[in-house]
């Protein structure tokens, strides 16, 4: 699920944008607990609002994009923490929200993750052509009538959805890492954008499985364990694999 979206984050250099949306998730958690709303739905709505607010400020404010991203990222995180601190009547597992807690996931969460994940993948498949065209060249996408602005809007909505449904597994502070690292790893092996998205999905799924297995075995936080697994995959991808294969074939004794 995170793989294809992560590819667009890497291609568009939107890592800090992903951080901003993921940090705003904690504000969504605080509002959900305060108003007794569904956490996943509230986080999704708050993430979309923050994304729209960012677009509005970029058009009207005097600050640069980096400054706006930093302002919104840390402001929403700080406000969320302050609101949670005042809610003394609610028992909040702050570490679970920040770094993920596999034990906090119930059957309803699993259903939401599956349905939400399939919906995100289906929506991404529908806007893939226009979104990729807008990534390569915005003007050409407009000239060809691919409606890149609409694709960009839905991309932000899909980002918010991924953050909302994966927050309990990875945690709000590490969601962006799960989006970026598998995509960065897949980039070294893929020969086409579609192949990169598929490989990134496979690497992301493997990282989640290995990370959760390690978390259960060694009693480590789920989110950091998943990110460490993804990081190990990226480090392995940096090794001169082709050179090693050639070396092994060269050292193999000749037959006959």
Where do the PLM segments sit?
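Short loop segments and helix-boundary regions at transmembrane helix junctions
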Residues: 7-90, 186-198, 215-218, 241-243
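Cytosolic-side transmembrane-helix boundaries in multi-pass membrane proteins
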Residues: 220-256
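Hydrophobic alpha-helical transmembrane segments
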Residues: 40-45, 70-71, 110-115, 150-157, ...
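Small-residue-rich segments of transmembrane alpha-helices in multi-pass membrane proteins
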Residues: 24-34, 72-84, 104, 148-160, ...
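Transmembrane alpha-helical segments in multi-pass inner-membrane proteins
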Residues: 169, 175-224
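Transmembrane helix-bundle core of multi-pass membrane transporters
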Residues: 61, 69-129, 157
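Structural signature of hydrophobic alpha-helical transmembrane segments
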Residues: 37-49, 114-118, 164-178, 224
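Membrane-helix/interface signature in polytopic inner-membrane proteins
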Residues: 122-155
């Amino acid at each position: 699920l995170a793989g294809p979206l992560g590819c667009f984050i890497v291609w568009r250099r939107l890592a800090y944008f992903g951080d901003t949306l993921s940090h705003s998730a904690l504000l969504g958690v605080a509002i959900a607990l305060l108003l007794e709303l569904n956490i996943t739905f509230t986080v999704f709505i708050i993430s979309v609002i923050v994304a729209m607010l960012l677009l509005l400020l970029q058009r009207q404010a005097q600050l640069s994009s980096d400054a706006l991203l930093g302002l919104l990222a840390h402001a929403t995180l700080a406000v969320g923490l302050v609101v949670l601190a005042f809610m003394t009547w609610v028992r909040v597992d702050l570490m679970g929200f920040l770094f993920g807690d596999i034990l906090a996931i119930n059957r309803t969460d699993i259903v939401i993750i599956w349905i939400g994940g399939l919906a995100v993948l289906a929506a991404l498949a529908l806007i893939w052509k226009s979104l990729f065209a807008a990534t390569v060249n915005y003007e050409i996408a407009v000239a060809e009538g691919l409606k890149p602005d609409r694709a960009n809007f839905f991309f932000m909505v899909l980002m918010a959805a991924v953050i909302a449904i994966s927050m309990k597994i990875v945690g709000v502070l590490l969601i962006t890492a799960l989006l970026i690292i598998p995509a960065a790893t897949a980039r070294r092996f893929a020969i086409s954008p579609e192949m990169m998205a598929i490989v990134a999905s496979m690497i992301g799924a493997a990282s989640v499985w290995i990370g959760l297995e390690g978390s259960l075995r060694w009693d480590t936080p789920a989110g950091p364990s998943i990110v460490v697994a993804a990081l190990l995959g990226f480090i392995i991808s940096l090794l001169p694999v082709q050179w090693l294969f050639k070396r092994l074939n060269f050292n193999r004794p000749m037959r006959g």
